[in-house]
Design a protein with these regions (language model features):
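Metalloprotease/metallohydrolase-associated module, dominated by Zn2+-dependent proteases
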Residues: 1-47, 63-100
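Active-site recognition of the HExxH zinc-binding catalytic motif
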Residues: 50-62
C-alpha cells in the first residue's frame, strides 16, 4: 500500500510528504500552521507507519487545544506505540470500531 498524500483531521486537510530536511533525531514533523506532516525517508516501512500515526496524534493534540508541551511528546510516543500494537494484533476490533 502506498503512502497517502493527505489525511483529514477534524475537518482539516493535512498534506503528507517526505522531507530531506529532517535532522538526525527526527523521523517526522507536524507543521500545524501549514497543515503538513513531513516524514523522513530514512526509515523502514513499519517505522514510517508508526511515525505517520505519531504525527497524526500530534495534530489531534493541537486541534483539540491540548497545549501542554511538557507532556505532549511522551504522551504521543506512548499512545502511538500502544495504539498501533493493539490495532495490529486485533484487526477485528479495528474493523468493528471503524464500522459504519
Amino acid at each position: 500500500m502506498n503512502l497517502p498524500s493527505e489525511v483529514e483531521i477534524f475537518g482539516h486537510c493535512y498534506q503528507i510528504c517526505f522531507s530531506s530536511e529532517m535532522n538526525d533525531e527526527e523521523l517526522g514533523r507536524c507543521d500545524q500552521t501549514r497543515q503538513i506532516i513531513f516524514l523522513s525517508k530514512e526509515q523502514g516501512a513499519d517505522s514510517l507507519r508508526d511515525t505517520l500515526l505519531h504525527e497524526i496524534i500530534h495534530a489531534v493534540h493541537w486541534l483539540m487545544g491540548l497545549n501542554d508541551k511538557s507532556t505532549e511528546e511522551e504522551f504521543t510516543a506512548r499512545t502511538t506505540t500502544g495504539l498501533r500494537s493493539v490495532m495490529l494484533q486485533n484487526p477485528e476490533v479495528v474493523e468493528y470500531v471503524l464500522g459504519r
